[in-house]
Amino acid sequence: MESWDLIIIGSGPAALRAAVAAADSGTTPVLIESSGIGAGNSNLDLAGMAASIDEISSSAHRDDTITAGGESTDKIAAARVCGEGVGVLAELERWGLVLRRRDGGLPHASQVSGHSMPRLTGCGDATGRNTTRILEEQAMKRGVLRRADLRAMSLVMDGNQVRGITAYDMSSGEVVGIQSKAVILATAGHQGIWSGSANGAGLGSSLAASAGISLSGLANNPTHPLTVRGTDLNISIDVLGSGGRVRKSSGEDVAS
């Protein structure tokens, strides 16, 4: 039976960054990308990365995140993620991500819904694609194996300890077992169940729930505000942050 230190299920920036971190720590990971290599959820519509680049601290960013997320927000996680924003952005720049710039050389920051300050940085509508490419390069440099021929079906549990996964091998048509010491679910969200697959089909949530793992924070489900009806096309939210306007056929503003 195939065996790994770590199985990472997902194909977007979160999965790729987890693989890079695992490899750097001396762990041997494998990426299970059932949607196909390069088909990560954030490839097209990632608007940018929020970072407190013009603020003394990340406390206001943390507070905005908690307010937007509601009472179920994990405050400790919000503080950690917001606090790491500037460092993560600098790391991606060192690895080759070319950000939009403003006069003076600092990254351009847009103000978007949910933020009290301009924080959204990135590469315009190429942010998702470029971020994924940079992380793919880093994963390749570390020799991370990426499997696009498998689709995760279930987690294999031994009490409260995960022992691996069962997966459908699309090349052979067989169901196979893969052992691992740990599994990271880095899939897209599940809001696409209501709004379209481009916003996440809920694979990670489904795998966890089916294995008896308690889910939390599901009361508030984010939805992409600029999804074109009847399609899986998401328009980058940075369109609004850069001064764009959404109007009804009457000319009345819907958002700006």
Give the residues covered by each predicted segment.
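Hydrophobic alpha-helical scaffolding
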Residues: 67, 71, 75-82, 121-129, ...
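Gly-rich Lys/Arg/Thr-decorated short loops/hinges at beta-loop-alpha junctions or inter-strand turns
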Residues: 46-47, 72, 110-119, 186-188
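A short small-residue
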Residues: 62-70, 115
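Residues forming the flavin
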Residues: 1-63, 101-103, 123-256
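Short, charged low-complexity intrinsically disordered segments located at boundaries
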Residues: 91-97, 118-123, 237-239
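Rossmann-like flavin
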Residues: 69-108, 112
